[in-house]
Amino acid sequence: GKPVVGVVLIPVKNEIYYAVEGGGAFYESLNGENLKISASHKSEYNEMVMVKSRSHASEKLMKLIDKYKFKDVKDSGSSIKICLIARGLADIYFRFGNTNEWDICAAHCVLSEAGGKMTDCLGNTLIYNKVDPLNRNGFIASNNAIHSKFVEMAQETI
């Protein structure tokens, strides 16, 4: 299956991201900010912000960071990275290695509704609600401007 509703709550920041298939993606904060969000359209690496995991940095990822000169590389937690791309505050997130589908499903819906894209690292559509809930080929979340190029970049590291 595919995600059709997504809600990502970030209690420590008093923020929430949510989306329903066909209805757009939204961000709200406790201070009253309420925005319809969309991914950026940046396509030049030196203008893009990469987000990465504090706890899952890999040799593959470090090779990409060294080779491609992104504007900035920021650490962030879990599904928050995907939501930052959906909001246009970041542009690319590579996750090499296994992930559980429940860790990314809601954020995937938010990103898709914001105009971004997520695939596995081979460029295949992510499938949810499988017998085996593990995504064994990692994933790439992007602003979608040059997603196919990011898939090629991921292949360089394999």
Predicted regions and their residues:
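Acidic beta-strand-loop-alpha-helix segment within the catalytic core
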Residues: 1-83, 136-158
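Oxyanion/phosphate-interacting regions
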Residues: 63-67, 83-158
